[in-house]
Amino acid sequence: AIRGLTDRPRSAISGNSSYTAARIGDVYGVEAGVLLPSVVSDEFPTEAGLDESSETHDIAEPYAVSVGRAGWVKGTWETVSMLAGSGISLAHVGGGAGEDLARLTQHAESCGVGLWVAPRLSSPEMAALIRGARAVVSMAHGEPFGLTPVEAISVGTPALMVDEGGFRDTVIDDVNGRLLPRDDLGAWHSALEQAADGRTRTAWAESGRARIAEMDLSPDAHCRRLESVLDCL
């Protein structure tokens, strides 16, 4: 389908990150530009809003948050395995098939990791959950862009991401979060300890917000970039 599009006159192919654009080139042999996604920033405000609930969820603290439907591609089982022995529980947001969630619960129990599977959350509820977390973590495979670190950084919670995929566009290692080797569990545990330090959290949040502002993921900027692509056709 992509090769067919490139054969059409006045056509352009874009990926939502430098990783996605590179993968399009590797797989299809066609040149692709980068068209960053848009993010509505006020859904994850810097300061807690009045609509954010202070309700304590049924999960032992400290906890980390992972986002995405439970499955291999999101690295959900790997995340639980990584947390074993860390003393950190996991709040899983994104649901999944009933059978998969049952297996995930059994896996967490076998690893001694506390697990809370979140119900459907509103944006304020999601922001509150992330704000109270030690970190937001992801071991996703081939994540095209990854909005999760943007959401975490916006509310001031450390983003600990696997050093792969589109996460490299938003996270600069040890500047505004961490990019970590998938198989180095010691590095992940050290990063989770690092994320507990108040000064580190503040420094990463400030650098992260500056990075997001530099990328300008606003809907208006997205429209301007899309218009620029169309103007070049």
How should each PLM-predicted stretch be described?
Residues 67, 88-104, 119:
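Glycosyltransferase donor-sugar binding loop
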Residues 187, 199-230:
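A charged, aromatic-enriched C-terminal amphipathic alpha-helix characteristic of glycosyltransferases
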Residues 1-13, 20-22:
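Membrane-proximal helix-turn-helix segments that form the acceptor-binding/catalytic region
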